Swiss-Prot record:
It comes from the Bacteria. It comes from Synechococcus elongatus. Residues 19-93 form the Rhodanese domain. The lineage of its organism: Bacteria, Bacillati, Cyanobacteriota, Cyanophyceae, Synechococcales. It holds the Pfam family Rhodanese. InterPro entries: Rhodanese-like_dom, Rhodanese-like_dom_sf. This is Uncharacterized 16.5 kDa protein in psaL 5'region. SUPFAM superfamilies: Rhodanese/Cell cycle control phosphatase (SSF52821). Gene3D superfamilies: Rhodanese-like domain.
Length: 150
């Protein structure tokens, strides 16, 4: 199977700024993480659903000839782990590891602790929230995309 390319946050922003509408952004994190912070316009299909089968059909139904962009909290091998299962033909993957490297300023609007997350995961989510705040143009661009109903 061919190597699945990764996409940086800057490349995603450029894609969104271009007005392209030929892709579906799938978030494979768990529902609690998705509830806390998400890229507007992304569709939640947890990795557990993909690995157990029903998520595969959900993603296939969303594609309709569009490119599939996948992001998760861990980045690197995680999106590739299920992509290489050969149940889906993926063309692109977003490295969540890269997207968590946003500006690390404090975020007063986001609580510094969350009982649902461990200490290390809280830090990652705070970095993710900082990234979303700093890249508000990215959020506006995603919000302008047509909504996908499931």
């Amino acid at each position: 199977m061919a190597e699945i390319p990764e996409m940086t946050v800057q490349e995603l922003k450029a894609l969104m700024d271009s007005g392209a509408q030929d892709y579906v952004l799938v978030d494979v994190r768990n529902p609690n993480e998705y509830e806390i912070a998400r890229i507007p316009g992304s569709v939640l299909v947890p990795l557990s659903e993909i690995e157990n089968g029903p998520g595969v059909e959900k993603i296939r139904s969303l594609l309709n000839g569009h490119r599939l962009l996948v992001h998760c909290k861990m980045g690197g091998p995680l999106p590739k782990r299920w992509a290489s299962s050969k149940r889906l033909a993926l063309r692109e993957s977003i490295s969540k590891g890269a997207s968590t490297l946003g500006v690390r300023k404090s975020t007063p609007a986001y609580p510094p602790t969350n009982p649902r997350l461990g200490a290390g995961r809280r830090k990652g989510m705070l970095r993710y929230m900082n990234f979303l705040e700093e890249k508000h143009a990215l959020s506006r661009a995603i919000a302008a995309l047509p909504r996908i109903t499931t």
